[in-house]
Regions:
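Conserved catalytic-core motifs of eukaryotic protein kinase domains, centered on the activation segment
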Residues: 18-19, 38, 62
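A short glycine-rich, His/Asp/Glu-containing loop-to-beta-strand
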Residues: 1-15, 72, 77
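Histidine-centered catalytic micro-motifs
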Residues: 14-20, 55
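Short, conserved beta-strand element in jelly-roll/cupin
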Residues: 6-8, 19-34, 72
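Short acidic-glycine-tyrosine-enriched beta hairpin
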Residues: 39-53
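Ligand-binding loop in jelly-roll beta-barrel domains
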Residues: 33, 53-78
């Protein structure tokens, strides 16, 4: 599955996990902070974040503009 996620300033995608499915995020625009497992990562346009299957992950838009993320999940969620 491929999709586009957009978060407004200060909006958060709560921490969650996908059993049996890896997920990637490619930052198209904006800035944010990801948590993947026990790690935290600040991102900007061009950054890539990978959340392996079963690992909790979430993101917060820490910038002043919309955070746009191209996402991919494989295999897709059923």
């Amino acid at each position: 599955m491929i999709g586009l996620n957009c978060l407004e300033p200060n909006q958060t995608q709560p921490v969650h996990a996908h059993a049996g499915a890896d997920k990637f995020y490619f930052v198209l625009s904006g800035a944010g902070r990801f948590s993947v497992g026990d790690e935290e990562k600040t991102v900007e346009a061009g950054s890539v974040v990978i959340a392996p299957a079963g690992i909790a992950h979430g993101v917060t838009n820490t910038g002043a503009e919309r955070l746009s993320l191209l996402i991919g999940i494989a295999p897709g969620i059923k």
